[in-house]
Amino acid sequence: MVRGPKKHLKRVAAPHHWLLDKLSGTYAPKPSPGPHKARECLPLIVFLRNRLKYALNGREVKAILMQRLIKVDGKVRTDSTFPTGFMDVISVEKTGEHFRLVYDIKGRFTVHRITAEEAKYKLCKVKRVQLGAKGVPFLVTHDGRTIRYPDPLIKVNDTIKLNLETNKIESFIKFDTSAQVMVTGGRNMGRVGTIVHREHHLGSFEIIHVKDALDREFATRLSNVFVIGETGKSWISLPKGKGVKLSITEERDRRRALKGLA
């Protein structure tokens, strides 16, 4: 009888959005327990080796991490399989580079560079608000943080702006119509738009209708929506494409136009 946790992950069973090829080994990095789910995270080794190409293999990644050069959300991380996830800020001390993990329109984590000023904060979705021991109010965010004594106006599904140096809430955005959102799950993953309408379904999933920059409307579940800004203004910089999903023919026409200019 098998006992204990699984310590290995076969390469073919790894999440598709890691973009690992099947023929370069039998195994993939098994994410450590941490703030993000195994299927929704990107281990540090995959980010440094496969995306940034700062290392050729796992041994080189460990050598980089053991020099304490890599910070995630302002904290030094030395675990090569540490699970980084949506909205995390990864800083490389030696090069002065900062990255925010956000999705592209195909639902994959993209290498999105940000300024040092923007790297000082991150956005967190509020998953739970309740009273703790001795009546102390607290909230829990999407990345597992517990913050005591929040603003009483902050409710579930709102987004807080968290200062990574002080770990204090600087501001928050209400989950409401006309708020700007990014979709973090489902077939519309990575798309950005404005909330148009909210459908309530008792005993079932609430449906959110979103309109993107090209006035195309789509719908997704409430749990898949992450508020990133107020009306017409995002609180974070967006990756290439600005979260607008194009059809295959539109992508083809854009490529042809760029070739014609070249």
From Swiss-Prot:
Further remarks about this protein from its record: There are 3 genes for eS4 in S.pombe.
Localisation per UniProt entry: Cytoplasm
Pfam families noted in UniProt: 40S_S4_C, KOW, Ribosomal_S4e, RS4NT
Protein name: Small ribosomal subunit protein eS4A
Alphabetized SMART domains for the sequence: S4 (SM00363)
Complexes and interactors: Component of the small ribosomal subunit (SSU). Mature yeast ribosomes consist of a small (40S) and a large (60S) subunit. The 40S small subunit contains 1 molecule of ribosomal RNA (18S rRNA) and at least 33 different proteins. The large 60S subunit contains 3 rRNA molecules (25S, 5.8S and 5S rRNA) and at least 46 different proteins.
Gene: rps401
Any Gene Ontology CC annotation: cytosol
Top-level taxon: Eukaryota
Domain S4 RNA-binding: 42-105
InterPro entries named among the record's database cross-references: KOW, Rib_uL2_dom2, Ribosomal_eS4, Ribosomal_eS4_C, Ribosomal_eS4_central_region, Ribosomal_eS4_central_sf, Ribosomal_eS4_KOW, Ribosomal_eS4_N
Family per record: Belongs to the eukaryotic ribosomal protein eS4 family.
Keyword vocabulary terms for this entry: Cytoplasm, Ribonucleoprotein, Ribosomal protein, RNA-binding, rRNA-binding
Keyword Metal-binding: no
HAMAP family: Ribosomal_eS4
Chief place of localization: cytoplasm
Gene Ontology terms, MF aspect: RNA binding; rRNA binding; structural constituent of ribosome
Example GO biological process: cytoplasmic translation
Spans through the membrane: none
